[in-house]
Amino acid sequence: MTIIRKKHPLIKIINHSFIDLPTPSNISSWWNFGSLLGLCLIMQILTGLFLAMHYTSDTATAFSSVAHICRDVNYGWLIRYMHANGASMFFICLFLHVGRGVYYGSYNMIETWNMGIILLFAVMATAFMGYVLPWGQMSFWGATVITNLLSAIPYIGTTLVEWIWGGFSVDKATLTRFFAFHFILPFIITALVLVHLLFLHETGSNNPTGLNSDSDKIPFHPYFTIKDFLGALILLMAFMILTLFFPDILGDPDNYTPANPLNTPPHIKPEWYFLFAYAILRSIPNKLGGVLALILSILILAIMPLLHTSKQRTLTFRPITQTMYWILVADLFILTWIGGQPVEYPFTIIGQTASIAYFTIIVILMPIAGMIENNILDLD
């Protein structure tokens, strides 16, 4: 078996990636989320495939086809709710994975980090298009509002929006193409994940100390396969509790009403995992400014390596920057809450304050904190 594992052209790639991979011995449970994201991706592709067998991407029948899946298909209700809540689990793992990367300075592995940002955008695009497919009220109006943001682009904006719509409003052509893109994107994401892993295995994993761990590496199997398996069990347990006991808790009741272009819902809002970015978008009165802030709220991650001023890689031994980091996390929770609130006082002012705080902490306060900590170290 050892000979095949190490000599076979295909199996040896798997061997070097998941079995004999030299791994830092001290990586904590925060390093579990990569494998959990892989598990989420596999679950989403499988449940999505079974849903696609029964779904019809036509405005006249899309809503009915989803109802048919839930009522008439064997375990269709389970597949549908696993897919819907699987997206939420995916984003929980994604946010924790990115948060871990920021905390432990993993952004210094620039190729891996940039690939991760591309993956984040791809997953967000996939989730957005998937939310449109059931063709409920929030699906329709969410698609209308978010695609309309592109009209803020000077000169080509309106033409671009109509090109994406395939007409002069969100209609049959839009739904059909969104289904096509929603189907193909997860496979593109899978390919990007392999590139992400390729870059990661060029440098090796980071670790909680941020120090070089070449002198203290252990094989990935069995130590971390067991650890990842435990993480997967915990994730699946939480996921099944969510899916079987609270399937609609993260959804919007408006999406159980068929799409009606003549009736606007009182509060148009995206799924919970986009609310922080939506709050940043709404906090700027100017349309183009809002769109730029929305894109920058994610793209700001790309300049994190440039904002790293500390002599130490991680935040493990940096209490001042740690404080800034946890204030940033609290700020993101506030933004998520504000994104789901109506546009009225005091929510608007809270949203604007939280949006300013978000960019200020990342661009100004954390780099300054890093420099202060450098000076404290020099004093010693």
Swiss-Prot record:
It holds the Pfam family Cytochrom_B_C. The keyword Transport applies. One of its GO terms (molecular function) is ubiquinol-cytochrome-c reductase activity. It is found in: Mitochondrion inner membrane. Keywords: Electron transport, Heme, Iron, Membrane, Metal-binding, Mitochondrion, Mitochondrion inner membrane, Respiratory chain, Transmembrane, Transmembrane helix, Transport, Ubiquinone. This is Cytochrome b. The gene is MT-CYB. Belongs to the cytochrome b family. It comes from the Eukaryota.
